[in-house]
């Protein structure tokens, strides 16, 4: 596996935030393979700041990277910078959240985000014959938008399921708590919360506990993160999470990167399926780590 050429291949990676173990898990997979090849990976954390991410990309380009792996903070404001990267002859792979103009990029590796939302909605409709639903969103990330749309489209034709409120929380636990509190303070009654990811579901759980609603409200997330899997087994309020596999996303990303560099054929779009984890099938999963 070791790179016998004298030239080390340089990879640059920037994820919307490293304040989410999901992205750490994606990056670890990539890093392992890069290290095995004797190549180099530079990883950057823009901490949800699109301007900072643009600067980091320019910095990575100046380090002489051959491939940029990007998980965009915002799906459209990044396009201008990516065009410059492309002009410099650098390969661009987008992971987990697409960019709005996929003509600029060489490959997009994502979970089936729309289906993740569909799975949660279908499970909810099987469990409850009617529901008033609050949504916690991240409107600037296309992956999150796809999940919310999958959920909304599934319940849209059935009047027993009403979406009664929604707030943006950037997919962060510490912003999800006040976001759901805001819906509660508006006097809106709801019995289900659909969260764009598991960190958001943690914030939602904290909010319903704070407001003594943990026996009346049920929460769905997306990710299949270790802490939500543990809570699925232990709490009544967390009902399900549509699980992504950051290990698969990382493996697919770096596999396609080396294919490009070796001028082999590759797919421009790779979609990794998601699976719903519930109380009924939680024993089948390792709750200490990611899948």
Give, region by region, the residue ranges found by the protein language model:
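Hinge/cleft segment of the Venus flytrap/periplasmic-binding protein
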Residues: 1, 154-155, 245-291
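Short, low-complexity disordered leader/linker segments with a strong preference
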Residues: 1-9, 83-90
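Extracytoplasmic "Venus flytrap"
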Residues: 10-29, 33, 37, 41-55, ...
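Short, solvent-exposed amphipathic alpha-helices that sit
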Residues: 22-39, 116-120, 143-161, 175, ...
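Short beta-strand elements in bilobed, periplasmic/extracellular small-molecule ligand-binding domains
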Residues: 34-46, 132-137, 155-174
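Hydrophobic alpha-helical segments within soluble ligand-binding/sensing domains
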Residues: 53, 109-133, 145-146, 173-180, ...
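Hydrophobic alpha-helical
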Residues: 67-85, 151, 164-165, 170-230
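Flexible loop/hinge segments that line or gate small-molecule binding clefts
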Residues: 75-115, 126, 132, 225-234, ...
